[in-house]
Design a protein with these regions (language model features):
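Binuclear metal-dependent hydrolase catalytic cores
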Residues: 1-91, 169-171
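Cap/insert and terminal regions of metallo-dependent hydrolase folds
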Residues: 9, 80, 89, 97-171
Length: 171
């Protein structure tokens, strides 16, 4: 409520639809807040900014770079991010397979967070579709190669997916 204007949101293709959809679905709540709290409705608006590979944001010493990565044939575009601030570099792979473009941008990062996914042979036998999901991500071996090639000061894993051989029922 203390924001002095609209919220600026940066995103890939589709961000305009998300901003417009959010504006539409929050109308009842927004109307109440405008009436009850005397909030300027324009301060509740989302202003979308579409980005592609390259510099997304560069202001007051903070630089954010989108790095196109490979998250599968049908999931395009997909981006990793490099954040530079006060002489430090943070890189986050987001969802990706092994990717040379990411490796080039992640050299000697202070912090490099990379996703990883794996499954046992029993998982693939019990659920052949599991291979489709796993093929969209970096394997533990891939991530080991990435960290060896980029030599970050701190390497971390995220999106730790280890699919079980048999799906667990819900409920």
């Amino acid at each position: 409520a203390n924001r002095g204007g609209p919220l600026h949101v940066y995103g890939p293709p589709g961000v305009n639809d998300i901003a417009e959809g959010s504006w539409l679905v929050t109308r009842p709540d927004r109307d109440i807040r405008v009436a009850d709290h005397e909030i300027d409705p324009e301060h509740m608006r989302i202003i979308p900014h579409l980005y592609s590979e390259g510099v997304v944001f560069d202001r007051n010493g903070l630089k954010i770079i989108a790095i196109e990565v490979d998250h599968g044939e049908f999931i395009r575009p997909a981006y990793a991010f490099r954040v530079e601030y006060c002489g430090h570099v943070f890189v986050h792979s987001h969802d990706t397979r092994y990717n040379e473009n990411l490796i080039a941008q992640a050299q000697e990062a202070d912090v490099f967070i990379h996703e990883v996914a794996a499954a046992t042979p029993a998982t693939f036998e019990a659920n052949p579709r599991a291979k489709i999901a796993i093929d969209h991500h970096a394997t533990p071996q891939d991530v080991g190669r990435v960290f060896a090639q980029t030599r970050p000061k701190l390497a971390m894993l995220t999106h730790l997916v280890l699919l079980p051989p048999h799906p667990m029922p819900i409920g």
